A protein has these predicted regions:
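Short proline/glycine-enriched turn/loop segments at secondary-structure junctions
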Residues: 183-187, 213-220
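Functional-site microenvironments in short loops/helix caps that host divalent-cation chemistry
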Residues: 1, 11, 27-209
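Short, structured beta-strand segments at or near domain termini in extracellular proteins/domains
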Residues: 222-230
Length: 230
């Protein structure tokens, strides 16, 4: 996949940053939203990420596995749909990255001209490099794993939260079906958006820079966040 020059955020968007979008009326500004996303937001009366609420006008809290806690300002935002991520990106004058851009930022080492299996290199994931395997039961604060950064300095690209991309889930050129074709092939070209990077709940043996996940644009999964590109 070819990419031209682009910039990618060094970290996923945080709760602190996303709260500014909420407080600036981002959920009321139709011009920021994809038309289908605006219709969904109106029908569902969406005003903030899933499980966010205000116990009083001055504080935001969230629910995590049935427990209520203050919003963790420097943790990656979660419970946002693709439409919400896209609207936020427009609000900050950016966009969501394509999956090719995301993969290049995670994989390419410009000093050697080679691709890495993981952002930090080809060594297997461990607790110093990424938040995986349900060990923390939540994402860490952004930047908590400097040893896991990519050659370009982007952190948190493996683990913590899956990340929305701008790309539709479709077959690569020359794709040949896995023997279990129902794993991915039947989902191609049906409106799914590509997710990359794994989450804090992903098994280490199941993730790599090239792994593709997917979901509907309206889904607000617990384990999904995003970062922006420009």
């Amino acid at each position: 996949m070819e990419t031209s020059g682009f910039y990618l955020d060094a970290t996923p968007v945080t709760n602190r940053a996303y709260l500014q979008f909420v407080q600036d009326g981002g959920y009321d500004r139709e011009e920021l939203w994809d038309p289908e996303g605006w219709e969904w937001r109106e029908e569902e009366a969406i005003r903030a990420p899933g499980h966010w609420y205000q116990p009083d006008p001055h504080r935001w809290w969230t629910q995590c596995f049935g427990f209520d806690e203050p919003l963790r300002a420097d943790a990656p935002v979660m419970h946002v749909s693709w439409f919400e991520a896209d609207a936020y990106a427009r609000w900050v004058g950016k966009r969501l990255p394509t999956e090719a851009e995301w993969e290049k930022a995670a994989s390419w080492d410009p000093s050697t001209g080679t691709k890495r299996l993981y952002p930090w290199g080809d060594e297997s994931p461990n607790g110093a490099r990424a938040n995986l395997d349900q060990l923390a039961f939540r994402p860490a604060e952004v930047g908590a794993y400097p040893a896991g950064a990519s050659a370009y300095g982007s952190s948190g690209m493996i683990g913590d939260v899956w990340e929305w991309t701008a790309s539709e889930f479709s077959a690569y050129p020359g794709f040949e079906s896995f023997p279990y074709r129902e794993y991915s092939e039947i989902f191609f070209d049906k409106g799914y958006k590509v997710l990359r990077g794994g989450s804090w709940a992903t098994r280490p043996g199941a993730i790599r820079n090239t792994f593709r996940n997917w979901d509907f644009a309206i889904r607000r999964q617990l384990f999904v966040g995003f970062r922006c590109a420009s």
